Curated annotation (Swiss-Prot):
Belongs to the peptidase M24A family. Methionine aminopeptidase eukaryotic type 2 subfamily. Residues 36-46, 97-109 have a biased composition (Basic residues). Its main location: cytoplasm. The gene is METAP2. Signal peptide: none annotated. The keyword Nucleotide-binding does not apply. This is Methionine aminopeptidase 2. Contains approximately 12 O-linked N-acetylglucosamine (GlcNAc) residues. O-glycosylation is required for EIF2S1 binding. It comes from Homo sapiens (Human). It catalyses: Release of N-terminal amino acids, preferentially methionine, from peptides and arylamides. The modification N-acetylalanine is found at residue 2. Binds 2 divalent metal cations per subunit. Has a high-affinity and a low affinity metal-binding site. The true nature of the physiological cofactor is under debate. The enzyme is active with cobalt, zinc, manganese or divalent iron ions. Most likely, methionine aminopeptidases function as mononuclear Fe(2+)-metalloproteases under physiological conditions, and the catalytically relevant metal-binding site has been assigned to the histidine-containing high-affinity site. Also manganese has been proposed to be the physiological cofactor for human METAP2.
Amino acid sequence: MAGVEEVAASGSHLNGDLDPDDREEGAASTAEEAAKKKRRKKKKSKGPSAAGEQEPDKESGASVDEVARQLERSALEDKERDEDDEDGDGDGDGATGKKKKKKKKKRGPKVQTDPPSVPICDLYPNGVFPKGQECEYPPTQDGRTAAWRTTSEEKKALDQASEEIWNDFREAAEAHRQVRKYVMSWIKPGMTMIEICEKLEDCSRKLIKENGLNAGLAFPTGCSLNNCAAHYTPNAGDTTVLQYDDICKIDFGTHISGRIIDCAFTVTFNPKYDTLLKAVKDATNTGIKCAGIDVRLCDVGEAIQEVMESYEVEIDGKTYQVKPIRNLNGHSIGQYRIHAGKTVPIVKGGEATRMEEGEVYAIETFGSTGKGVVHDDMECSHYMKNFDVGHVPIRLPRTKHLLNVINENFGTLAFCRRWLDRLGESKYLMALKNLCDLGIVDPYPPLCDIKGSYTAQFEHTILLRPTCKEVVSRGDDY
């Protein structure tokens, strides 16, 4: 504004000395100059975007250089945007392209965390899970081999038709492998049994991506100690602490869509039990080796007993022959049914029933330094709804409510009192007893050999596929 006022003052001074014509010309030229200056001012105030339209006069030379630099910068930015768009699959603006580029980096295969927390289904986004150990079936009694099954197109087609089922077992098995590896990294004397079970189950729920009855834990975590062989898990308030001289059987299960992995191992800290563990592991592997399509269950039991009893162990200066626990068995597994009807004995003299194509079995063996027979003992913690029970009228409201809770959360899978506590249930013991008395729910109390004895267990789940036998729960550990 100051420049415009100066020009106007100068014009009035000149008008006093010139004749009228000259005064008109002078006034015109002064007005033109003032207008030019106004235009320049306006163009400068508009900034770089308007500067591109300025006339190339001397005073605007600096502005033109600025505009040129701006244009160069914007051209470089456009080029970078184009490159980013190509990396980001070619759609969206530059910023979107950069974001997509970052997402592309994240698409790489996920790796398991420590401690494990990434669900198995996220580690294998293509939905194909690792196979277990594939074995050829044993030769038949007349000496014929089963090698033809691996090349038969018919058997391959049958195997492929059930691929979705096998894949569910494999996902559950991979979760089991990773959980038990994690457990072995921290389990130690001094921990309470409740602490051990809850830590194990929390990890299992994450890896299996628990989802109601579609995926989750197949049965409570067994952590039976010493002479107790099976079906012990702590109830609320149990203060039992794991000791250095304890021999602990960790038996837990996972499932996807009711396809159950039943797998167990024994944990010890004192090396004096090593031979006992070796005997039972060898017996379990013998049972797995003998199992197959058309194999008689009694033959598997006889082979297991022969291997188990070939071992002697020395514990605290006393020698024992390892005995198979004759009233504990392996078993067939059905969908949402841990015991599907057939039993695999671990001593001779069992049923002559044959294993069949497409069946799933838990091959488990128990060795003992005691009598080799177990009986019910201690407080019950395991329960399971009877698979074959029909409609039973229930009068008590609390019993009806508890049955609804069991149906919604466990169905026909086994459960324990801790899991009812976790769901917020309280004062349910009378209702639970009522369900047991009515035959709707079966109790499974701890099974123990004589006091002072030691028991060990190893177990795997096998699939009798049309082409081969798959030890689906096999791992690097056992």
